[in-house]
């Protein structure tokens, strides 16, 4: 009996690990691509539209010059550059990470929404993991509250 449970757990673990997908984003990518290492997406927005719990988005090295028209949303106070609203689970997080030893850099010098705080990564989803990338030149454009955020966590885990 214990042997059958162990074998079942082994195969279930293999099945679960097979269901996770790796997506890739690169400065030379195209959002009509499949999001693979050889044919990466161009934007995090496209990658986020595809991910499900357990998936990983690898961000290739290079400088991503973000433009204001690429912003995903906002409210009366904030402009969201990347609105990260999809959730992983406690057991199957969604990971956004720089690829291997490469260093992706998100340059926000051109994002200057008038009278708003800039939230580069506005995180409203839960069980998301971010690592191994830089965010530079985030602008402060609101006069009443001189604050902008690289990562703003809106109550997620």
Regions found by a protein language model. Name each.
Residues 45-48, 118-119:
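Short hydrophobic/charged patches on amphipathic alpha-helices used for structural packing
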């Amino acid at each position: 009996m214990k042997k059958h449970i162990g074998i079942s757990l082994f195969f279930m673990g293999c099945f679960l690990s097979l269901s996770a997908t790796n997506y890739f984003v690169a400065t030379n990518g195209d959002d009509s691509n499949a999001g693979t290492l050889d044919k990466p997406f161009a934007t995090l927005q496209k990658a986020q539209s595809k991910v499900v719990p357990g998936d990983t988005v690898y961000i290739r090295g290079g400088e991503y010059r973000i433009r204001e028209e690429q912003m995903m949303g906002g409210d009366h106070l904030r402009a969201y550059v990347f609105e990260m609203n999809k959730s992983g689970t406690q057991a199957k997080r969604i990971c956004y990470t720089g690829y291997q030893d490469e260093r992706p850099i998100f340059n926000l010098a051109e994002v200057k929404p008038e009278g708003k705080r800039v939230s580069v990564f506005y995180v409203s989803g839960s069980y998301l993991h971010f690592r191994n990338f830089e965010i530079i030149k985030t602008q402060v454009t609101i006069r009443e509250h001189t604050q902008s955020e690289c990562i703003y966590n809106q109550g997620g885990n």
